[in-house]
Amino acid sequence: LVEDNKGKAILNYGVMGGQYQPVGQVHVLNSILDFNMSPQQAISSPRAFHFNNIYKLEKEISKEIKDGLSKIGHNTQYIEETHGGGQAIKIDRKNGNLIGGSDPRKDGYAEGY
C-alpha cells in the first residue's frame, strides 16, 4: 500500500517472483510514480533481472539495450522464462476511479471496490 503525503492510499500493488520480488516491487512502483505509467503499462513492461552475474533480459527488451549493457561490461542473456507477476490498483481520488492492471505473464486480475 502506498500513501500520499496526507496519508491517503493511492496505490495497492504486489509483485511475486522469488528473488525477483524486491526488484519487481521497485520496478512497478518506480514506473507508476516516477514515469507516470498506468498500472497495466508498469506491470506489462519488459523486465531485466541481475542474477549470478548475468543480466537476464526478457525477449521484449531491444537488442540495442542488450548490446549497450554488454558494451559497458555486463554479461547479458535473453531468457524464455518470465520474471515474476503482479497486480496493481491505482486510486484516482480526483476522478473517483480505480485503475487496475494485471500481469499478462501469469493468470489473475486486479479487482477493487
Give the location of each predicted region:
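Terminal-appendage/accessory-domain detector
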Residues: M37-S38, I54, E64-Y113
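Proteins synthesized as precursors that undergo proteolytic processing into mature forms
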Residues: L1-I79
